Amino acid sequence: QWPRPQIPP
């Protein structure tokens, strides 16, 4: 697993 990019709402 790797840090997923944070997607704004």
Swiss-Prot record:
Coiled coil: none annotated. Expressed by the venom gland. It comes from the Eukaryota. GO terms for cellular component: extracellular region. The modification Pyrrolidone carboxylic acid is found at residue 1. Its main location: secreted. It is found in: Secreted. One of its GO terms (molecular function) is peptidase inhibitor activity. The keyword Ribonucleoprotein does not apply. Keywords: Hypotensive agent, Metalloenzyme inhibitor, Metalloprotease inhibitor, Protease inhibitor, Pyrrolidone carboxylic acid, Secreted, Toxin. GO terms for biological process: regulation of blood pressure. Belongs to the bradykinin-potentiating peptide family. This peptide inhibits the activity of the angiotensin-converting enzyme (ACE) by a preferential interaction with its C-domain. May also potentiate the hypotensive effects of bradykinin. This is Bradykinin-potentiating peptide 9a. It comes from Bothrops neuwiedi (Neuwied's lancehead).
